[in-house]
């Protein structure tokens, strides 16, 4: 299951018991739309093992600024409340 990540709830999910994968995207971003089905499948396949979230950078620019996101899509990986990885661009 995918969750909606916002400025208000990212800390809660980051500090949860499961690792967190966050897809930062925007509605106007073509590459973001290309990877959306992959992110959804990841959420389905690893349900209960990781939390997969989507964060619209237009609505949550504070999240993008905090993690220095300059290009989208960007995927952030968190474990134990810490950022442990970052991937910028569409996955090929």
Go through the PLM ranges and name each one.
Residues 1-51, 58-92:
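Proteins that catalyze or organize thiol-disulfide redox chemistry
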């Amino acid at each position: 299951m995918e969750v909606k990540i916002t400025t208000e709830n990212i800390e809660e999910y980051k500090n949860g018991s499961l690792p967190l994968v966050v897809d930062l995207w925007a509605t106007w971003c073509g590459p973001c739309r290309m990877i959306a089905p992959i992110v959804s499948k990841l959420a389905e396949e690893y349900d209960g093992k990781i939390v997969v979230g989507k964060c619209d950078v237009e609505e949550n620019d504070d999240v993008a600024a905090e993690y220095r996101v300059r290009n989208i899509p960007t995927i952030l990986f968190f474990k134990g409340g810490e950022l442990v990885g970052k991937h910028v661009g569409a996955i090929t």
